[in-house]
Swiss-Prot record:
Pfam families cross-referenced by the UniProt entry: Ribosomal_L10
Organism, as annotated: Kosmotoga olearia (strain ATCC BAA-1733 / DSM 21960 / TBF 19.5.1)
Keyword Ribonucleoprotein: yes
InterPro entries xrefs: Ribosomal_uL10, Ribosomal_uL10-like_sf, Ribosomal_uL10_bac, Ribosomal_uL10_bac_type
An individual GO BP term: translation
Keywords, alphabetical: Ribonucleoprotein, Ribosomal protein, RNA-binding, rRNA-binding
Function: Forms part of the ribosomal stalk, playing a central role in the interaction of the ribosome with GTP-bound translation factors.
Protein name, entry field: Large ribosomal subunit protein uL10
GO molecular function terms attached to this record: large ribosomal subunit rRNA binding
Keyword tRNA processing in record: no
GO annotation, cellular component aspect: ribonucleoprotein complex; ribosome
Family: Belongs to the universal ribosomal protein uL10 family.
SUPFAM superfamilies for the chain: Ribosomal protein L10-like
Amino acid sequence: MLTRAKKEQLVQEMTDRFSKASLILFTDYKGMDVQTISELRGQLYEKFEDKARYQVAKNTLIRLALRNASYEEEEWKEQVTGTTAILTIVDADPIEAIKIVYDFSKKKKLPVLRGCYLEKVFHDESKIPDLAQLPSREQLIAMVVSGFAAPISGLVYSLNGIISKLVYALNAIKDKKSE
């Protein structure tokens, strides 16, 4: 059993993490054994190292931390019931984390995804499959860069073609004068 001081410390740590988090994902871990939770944590650690934390805590402590971090109680009240575990992502791509947990949940049928805060905006469980389909931050950057690169590449090829024609014309003039 946790002492009062330990509980206060845990609430403070969660409050700090919730305040900085780009993603807070609420899950119901009922039916998950330690091995399954460890497997999910392993996948998250492999991708994010210490930027991701999948944490099981008492609902009363989670509620206190969410209130302290200024999240709207009407949004999360139904999420923090029963067996609750929370995934938080700090300083990393939240969409990639949603994809990992969503795919894990589809494959293992656990954990049950309840809802999330993505960049401080609440999304209920019906939106999570849509969020999991979004491209990751790296994919979006690649799309933008390729969008910028395509017109530049076209310009380079056009200029290259014009210069080649000019060189051919100058060579033709040179050959004609040398005759």
